[in-house]
Each structure stands twice: as C-alpha cells, then as structure tokens.
C-alpha cells in the first residue's frame, strides 16, 4: 500500500517564492556585463560590504548606461509605468549567451522614457515593449517585467544604497 502524499508543495501565490532566479555566487564581471549580472553581483556584495557594492554600481554604470535608469524606474516614486500590469506575451530570446542576443539594455535603455509617459499611443508603446523584451537576453527581460510591475528582485540593493551610489540623482 502506498503512502499518501502530504501536501502539494508551495501554494501558487506563496509569499516566500523567489521573484526571479538570481546568481548566488560571486563572479568577476567583464567590461560588457549586462544589467542583470551587475545587479546580482551588487546584491551579493551588499550583504558583506555596502561600500564595495556602491563602488561597483558607480563603476559599472559608467560601462553600462542602463544601470541608473533601471534603479530610477524601480525606486523613484514619481516614475510610474504606463504599460499594463501582469505578464507580457512575448517570445523569449533563445540566444545561448547574453552577448549573442540581438541587443541589450545597454543600448535600449533610451526607450524607457516611452514606457513611463503618454508621449506615444498605447498600442505603439506596447509594441515597442514587446520588441524590447524579445531582443534582449532572457534574464534582462525577466528583470524588466518585474520592474515594470513595481517588483524589485534584489533585496540587498535598496533605495538607500542607490542614493549613496548616485548622490547627484534624487530618488523621490
């Protein structure tokens, strides 16, 4: 006689479910590291030494211009997404490595202004969003989906850490 199973695992809306799979071990980042890798490493380093995490964010923001716009979108209460909430229907980029994807947030962060204002019609804005998600690496697309919905997956990269890393920028 077989034993009865006890429970079905974690319930669907469980609060302790990770928002996104993060890198958990420290790595040396290359000069062309993508935003997901930079923020994962900043999250790991911030657990041990906040000053090193701040320095890393400022250095890698100079190399990848998308770090600061993502932090502003995530932490600035004056910046609100004009895109519909919930998952976006798009075809995930199947590039085997992040540097083999069609594009990266490093080049596409200039489009962010259209996703937080009413400058373009809603249908065009949603089309631009889907095209952005389909062109960038999968992990960056997952990150952008969460940021769009107001969810921040990096618990140690906080608003105060961002304010210390970029003192000349105001995060309201």
Residue ranges, per PLM feature:
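N-terminal nucleic-acid-engaging modules of covalent nucleotidyltransferase systems
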Residues: 3-172
């Amino acid at each position: 006689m077989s034993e009865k199973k006890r429970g079905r695992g974690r319930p669907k809306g469980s609060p302790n479910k990770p928002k996104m799979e993060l890198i958990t071990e420290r790595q040396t980042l290359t000069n062309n590291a993508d935003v997901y890798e930079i923020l994962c490493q900043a999250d790991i380093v911030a657990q041990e030494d906040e000053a090193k995490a701040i320095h890393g964010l400022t250095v890698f923001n100079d190399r990848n211009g998308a770090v600061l716009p993502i932090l502003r979108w995530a932490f600035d209460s004056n910046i609100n997404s004009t895109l519909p909430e919930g998952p976006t229907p798009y075809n995930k980029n199947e590039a085997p490595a992040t540097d083999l994807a069609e594009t990266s947030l490093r080049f596409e962060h200039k489009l962010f202004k259209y996703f937080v204002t009413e400058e373009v019609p809603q249908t065009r804005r949603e089309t631009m969003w889907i095209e952005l998600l389909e062109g960038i690496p999968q992990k960056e697309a997952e990150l952008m989906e969460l940021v769009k919905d107001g969810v921040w997956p990096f618990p140690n990269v906080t608003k105060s850490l961002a304010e210390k890393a970029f003192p000349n920028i105001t995060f309201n």
